[in-house]
Amino acid sequence: MGKLIDIPIVVESGQKYKTSQGVTAIKDGIKSSGQDHERLPKPKWLRIVNHTTPAYSQVKEQVQKHRLATVCEEAKCPNISECWSHGTATIMLMGAVCTRACRFCSVDTGNPHGWLDAEEPENTAETVALMNLDYVVLTSVNRDDLPDGGANHYAKTIRAIKKRSPRTKVEALTPDFQGSERDVAVLLDSGLDVFAQNVETVERLTHPVRDNRAGYQQTLNVLAFAKKYRPDVLTKTSLMLGLGETDEEIIRTMDDLRAHHVDILTLGQYLQPTKNHLPIARYVTPETFSELRQIGLKKGFFEVASGPLVRSSYRADRVFKRDNLGLDV
């Protein structure tokens, strides 16, 4: 076992370190393999334009002031400057260390041993109120170390937001809670508007892409239960493309999702976060994303956000309103 590195020393990707809470974690989630896969050249349509506006600075200030983790930062989202410049952010609950190690994800992994910030629900609600958000997305790391997977913490946060900002729509992009319907029900009873859980990839690639504790059918079952338990709550999921799936498998996955009553689908290009993560198998063209969106709409999804830089929570407020995203994503 390598020597642990204490913050604030810069930690290289794949190294172990200790967080400020004393949790041992692996930076960016995947141990360093010492190998570097040859990368495909990035196509011109994936050029990211950085935005710097006063709104960007305001969001960053609020996030830092209230010690909030955002998936925008932790998952190295390519849209961070655009979304923050529009005054919106996806807030990540329950810390920045995940108990799982999916091979596409750059969130740090480890075992928090039950640690939770008891002030986080109220801090999050205060931040949402100060930012005067019409729509907020909450997500989190997986917390298999907690008996309920963090469902009650999620629910407390949503109730706190709704109490301070009753008009704010709340979307929760959650872990799978190991398939526990009881834990999912706790969250669904909190007053949220959209329940999201990501299937991430096609069934054939689930094992090599996701942590072994995740499952394609398990995710489908949780989404189906959410819709059955609370028909008034929209259900949503996301697929990354470019991991080695075929177009036929994508369409088959759409059929599986509709059979489990999923309302909203997002499709985006997988981007390799570090050399230790899964390599990109292909870059999907904007034209293909557009075609897949139309196929999804014909299959009955309320909305399909589909484009190279689309992520689970990208333009979530517009998706919620079914605001015909078109081809500009």
From Swiss-Prot:
Transmembrane segments: none
Domain Radical SAM core residues, every copy: 83-303
Catalysed reaction equations from the record: [[Fe-S] cluster scaffold protein carrying a second [4Fe-4S](2+) cluster] + N(6)-octanoyl-L-lysyl-[protein] + 2 oxidized [2Fe-2S]-[ferredoxin] + 2 S-adenosyl-L-methionine + 4 H(+) = [[Fe-S] cluster scaffold protein] + N(6)-[(R)-dihydrolipoyl]-L-lysyl-[protein] + 4 Fe(3+) + 2 hydrogen sulfide + 2 5'-deoxyadenosine + 2 L-methionine + 2 reduced [2Fe-2S]-[ferredoxin]
Enzyme class: transferase
List of residues binding [4Fe-4S] cluster 2: 98, 102, 105
GO cellular component, one term: cytoplasm
Keyword rRNA processing: no
Cofactor: how and how many bound: Binds 2 [4Fe-4S] clusters per subunit. One cluster is coordinated with 3 cysteines and an exchangeable S-adenosyl-L-methionine.
Entries under SMART domains matching the protein: Elp3
Binding site for [4Fe-4S] cluster 1: 72, 77, 83, 313
One term of GO molecular function: 4 iron, 4 sulfur cluster binding
Pfam families registered for this protein in UniProt: Radical_SAM
Keyword Cytoplasm among record annotations: yes
InterPro entries attached to this UniProt entry: Aldolase_TIM (IPR013785), Elp3/MiaA/NifB-like_rSAM (IPR006638), Lipoyl_synth (IPR003698), rSAM (IPR007197)
Broad class of where this protein is predominantly found: cytoplasm
Disulfide bonds: none
Cofactor or coenzyme needed: [4Fe-4S] cluster
Protein name: Lipoyl synthase
Metabolic or biological pathway: Protein modification; protein lipoylation via endogenous pathway; protein N(6)-(lipoyl)lysine from octanoyl-[acyl-carrier-protein]: step 2/2
Keywords for the protein's UniProt record, in alphabetical order: 4Fe-4S, Cytoplasm, Iron, Iron-sulfur, Metal-binding, S-adenosyl-L-methionine, Transferase
Organism whose genome encodes this protein: Legionella pneumophila (strain Lens)
Subcellular location: Cytoplasm
Enzyme Commission no: 2.8.1.8
Family, similarity comment: Belongs to the radical SAM superfamily. Lipoyl synthase family.
